[in-house]
Amino acid sequence: MMTSSQFVRKRRESALGLATGALLGCLALCVSAQASAEEVKAGPWRPLFDGRTLDGWTPKVAKHPSGENYHQTFVVDHGVIRVSYAGYDKLDGQFGHLFYKTPFKAYRLRLTYRFLTDGGLPDTPAWARSNSGIMFDSQSPESMTVEQPFPVSIEFQLLGKEGDTPRPTGAVCTPGTNITIDGVTAKDHCTPPTNAPTVPNGTWVKAELEVLPNGEISQKINGVVVHHYADVTLDPDDTVAGGAKPYILARGAQRVTDGYIALQSEGHPIEFKDVEIQELTAP
């Protein structure tokens, strides 16, 4: 039988062992994540937006064919891409996306955005107010149906402040896709971050996206990682990317390893600038 002093010493040794194990596990994850980010060859940063025109970009607005910039939804003004509703009377479900011309596989993307302080259209749904996003790993605009509201993609969601309720920017959403977070398939269409700010409209925010060759993805807001996930696959059971079922079923639940980048128009004016990309390759 152990004496009381032996018992206390044994408990301390056990607690120390657990703490040490937890610390080593954490360090291993940190080192692994760092290694994943470091074990790539990075090309030069280059602009996707020239600051003057929409050359290289293709609009796709729901209910309209690819290439039609309906009511000049996407305009360039003083070095920014602006989502404008000046020509609209109502939104009428006409969500839009502005696609860059070529798909990408592994890269870092950075841009700056701000929601304008003037409100959206009167029939913009409550969830879509002060709401936009960066779509990536996306299908092409030409492969979308005319009525399709959202492309099959991953969305780096951008939110502005609405009312007094916390509304952190930087969620990840999955129209037509699945992802895993900490090895578990995300159940909700959108997963909000736990450490991102609620940003008042009119404030410029820096958004950064990293898509590694091994399929790991990180999202940053103002330099802080707000999401890390992996394993992008198509979701045959999706109900969000309306009209995309044939596109998804033709490909099965396959892993998504590349795709297009698009900027979203979802019912509220927003501006984007300094859109740049750095392509990555495995060593």
Where are these regions (language model features)?
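N-terminal secretory signal peptides that target proteins for export/translocation
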Residues: M1-L16
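Bacterial N-terminal signal peptides
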Residues: G17-C30
